[in-house]
């Protein structure tokens, strides 16, 4: 009892507890790695049982202190080498650490490892417990030797070991959660295990490496890993502020398109030689076709598009003027490959109904009043500010009819059919009286001025033509905004990495443009 009244005893006890905890941190890390091989419901139990057994083993080693002191005497000796009991323990312990670290690193670095929990094969419970006890026994050697060198009092040493082990038991669960959330820490710790194993083997063979070098290397690596974790955390924080839809779309596009996709917003480069090698090893049936990439990109970017980029523009609408002669209306219906027509009074903004060409031809043959006939099917009108997702619901309610798009003043801007939405996703389907909007020639593209910018971006594999603050949706709108006025034929406009040469233009619009890439 008088022993605990001595202040030096309390100072020694506190010092020894701190040393035991510091020397046991590495043990906790590897206990967490081992327990991860068990089902989640058994991990806590394995840690508690394993560390409890390890506690009794440490107490047993302390009780046999007098015998441990004699471990420095030679047991095996000849003219080539000599080993003491301590050397043999260090040798076999170091070899065990090297073997265990190599196996664990191989599993962590193997790309074929199954991450699916349903297919994951867990290790046996007692197998992991035994490994925890063995691992703790190896790591406890330095702690036991430290205890012997610090205080030459067995009860104080046992109290310090018990307190340190209880604190380690409490800290084992949160430390395990941290390691499971940060897998790079696991690889780092396994690398430490290799270093420690090599050091134990070299020390057993008589090659003494100053512990300061080992601790300096471990400390420096930990600092670098802390920087990596901070950078990772800041990256995830910045990513969380971006719209989830945009992040999901970019992740899928990077997966499908690989090196061809570049996110200019976050300046993340996806050029990766390893990915290219992996992609080259896949067969043609496994890789994504260009059409599949185009459609996936169209689906993911549909919500970000404007109605103006999807609709058929006003100048391309085929409509019926009821004030025209019947024979001219009949010729128009027969010559135009459309099945639905807006019927208007003199101008497109005066829509009275949407009719089918076949039904209107029958009405003309039977001399039915066209105004009364067309008024039975009223047009569905939507504003040009409607988003594409809500547009899908409108098209479903239209039941195959077309939808008229107007601006805030009621002027018709265009029309939309289900085919227009399909073209926004899968690409252009030209009618019989149309030519493709984009025609590829040698090292250049011939593009109509009214071509949608989203389709053009996908075709040219670029991402810098569309800006959210701009209202234009066509190539002509982009070039006029870039020039500040309507460009003339023969003029060239440069928007890196592209060069736009105006081939055909009138006083009112751009008809045809040749696009080349800058060299």
From Swiss-Prot:
Membrane topology, from the record: Multi-pass membrane protein
CDD domains: CBS_pair_CorC_HlyC_assoc
Keywords on record: CBS domain, Cell membrane, Membrane, Repeat, Transmembrane, Transmembrane helix
A GO term for molecular function: flavin adenine dinucleotide binding
Location(s), subcellular: Cell membrane
Annotated Gene Ontology cellular component terms: plasma membrane
Residue span, CBS domain: 311-373, 374-434
Gene3D superfamilies: 3.30.465.10, CBS-domain (3.10.580.10)
Xref: InterPro entries: CBS_dom_sf, FAD-bd_PCMH-like_sf, FAD-bd_PCMH_sub2, Integral_membrane_TerC, Ion_transp-like_CBS, Transptr-assoc_dom
Aminoacyl-tRNA synthetase found in the keyword field: no
Transmembrane segments: 13-35, 48-70, 80-102, 123-145, 150-172, 185-207, 212-231
Disulfide bridges in this chain: none
Family: Belongs to the UPF0053 family.
Protein name: UPF0053 protein bbp_300
Organism annotation: Buchnera aphidicola subsp. Baizongia pistaciae (strain Bp)
């Amino acid at each position: 009892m008088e022993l605990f009244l001595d202040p030096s005893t309390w100072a020694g006890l506190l010092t020894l507890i701190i040393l035991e905890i510091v020397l046991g941190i590495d043990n906790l890390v590897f206990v967490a790695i081992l327990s991860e091989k068990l089902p989640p419901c058994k991990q806590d139990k394995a840690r508690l049982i394993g560390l409890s057994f390890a506690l009794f083993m440490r107490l047993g080693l302390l009780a046999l202190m007098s015998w441990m002191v004699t471990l420095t005497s030679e047991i095996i000796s000849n003219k080539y080498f000599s080993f003491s009991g301590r050397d043999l323990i260090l040798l076999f312990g170091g070899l065990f650490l090297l073997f265990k670290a190599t196996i664990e690193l191989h599993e962590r670095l193997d790309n074929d490892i199954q991450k699916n929990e349903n297919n994951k094969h867990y290790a046996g419970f007692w197998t992991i417990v035994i490994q925890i006890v063995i691992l703790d026994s190896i790591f406890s050697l330095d702690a036991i030797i430290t205890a012997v060198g610090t205080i030459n009092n067995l009860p104080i040493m046992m109290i310090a070991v018990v307190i340190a082990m209880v604190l380690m038991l409490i800290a084992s669960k949160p430390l395990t959660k941290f390691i499971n959330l940060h897998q790079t820490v696991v690889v780092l710790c396994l690398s430490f295990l290799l270093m420690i194993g090599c050091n134990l083997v070299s020390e057993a063979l008589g090659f003494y490496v100053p512990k300061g070098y080992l601790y300096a290397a471990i400390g420096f690596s930990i600092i670098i890993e802390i920087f990596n974790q901070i950078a990772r955390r800041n990256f995830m924080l910045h990513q969380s502020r971006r719209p989830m839809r945009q992040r999901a779309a970019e992740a899928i596009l990077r997966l499908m398109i690989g090196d061809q996709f570049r996110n200019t917003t976050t300046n993340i480069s996806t050029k990766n030689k390893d990915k290219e090698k992996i992609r080259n090893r896949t067969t043609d049936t496994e890789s994504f076709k260009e059409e599949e990439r185009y459609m996936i990109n169209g689906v993911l970017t549909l919500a970000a598009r404007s109605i103006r980029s999807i609709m058929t523009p006003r100048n391309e609408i085929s409509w019926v003027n009821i004030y025209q002669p019947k024979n001219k209306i009949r010729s128009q219906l027969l010559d135009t490959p459309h099945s639905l027509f807006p019927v208007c009074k003199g101008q497109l903004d005066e829509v009275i109904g949407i009719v089918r060409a076949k039904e209107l031809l029958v009405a003309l043959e039977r001399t039915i009043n066209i105004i009364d006939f067309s008024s039975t099917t009223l047009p569905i009108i939507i504003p040009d500010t409607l988003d594409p997702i809500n547009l899908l619901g409108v098209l479903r309610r239209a039941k195959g009819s077309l939808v008229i798009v107007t601006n805030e003043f009621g002027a018709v801007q265009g029309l939309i059919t289900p085919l227009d939405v399909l073209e926004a996703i899968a690409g252009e389907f030209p009618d019989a009286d149309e030519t493709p909007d984009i025609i590829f020639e040698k090292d250049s593209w011939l593009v109509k001025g009214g071509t949608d910018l989203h389709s053009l971006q996908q075709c040219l594999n670029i991402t810098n033509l569309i800006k959210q603050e701009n209202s234009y949706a066509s190539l002509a709108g982009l070039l006029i905004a870039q020039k500040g006025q309507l460009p003339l034929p023969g003029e060239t406009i440069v928007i890196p990495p592209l060069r736009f040469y105006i081939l055909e233009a009138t006083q009112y619009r751009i008809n045809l443009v040749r696009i080349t890439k800058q060299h």
